[in-house]
Amino acid sequence: MDVHAPTSAYTPSLASKRLIAAHGDREGATVGLMEVSEEAVQRYGIVAMDGDCIVDMVEKPSVSEAPSRLALCGRYVFPHNTKEALETCSYEEHGDLQSIALQKRWMDQGHLHGAVLDNTQWYDSGSPETWLQAQVDHALRRPDLGPAFAHWLEQRLNDYR
């Protein structure tokens, strides 16, 4: 997961299509999951599964507390009534509305499903450094921006050194 292919190896992702197909006509929500290394579990929300149902979530667990190596990767298919359901969640716990409270509610009801999205490039945008890396990679992969952006980036790096 932490190893990225060169930008020349880019092909469009089918992860969203795969997630929608996995969701089908289910009640509740389906979330994308990626398998991470044992050392990386402490950086993500990690889930336990029973078939395709998520039965437990642990936010940034230690290796010994992690129920698996399956991490929530920020791709979701939520039902049409999600906005109304979010309004019933408390602001107090996180200081704003977060979907994790709603996901836990669906999990408790047996309506939170997971789909492993292997063979997919995953960018973790949880830190400024990894967010910037994702932006640079995406810019370099775009035929309309990549060549000019690469030239500019090379000049900036030369100026920086």
Model regions: which residues?
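Conserved beta-loop-beta/alpha segment of the NTase-like Rossmann-fold superfamily
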Residues: 1-50, 78, 86-89
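Catalytic-core segments of class I nucleotidyltransferases/pyrophosphorylases
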Residues: 20, 53-151
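Terminal low-complexity segments of carbohydrate-biosynthetic enzymes
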Residues: 147-161
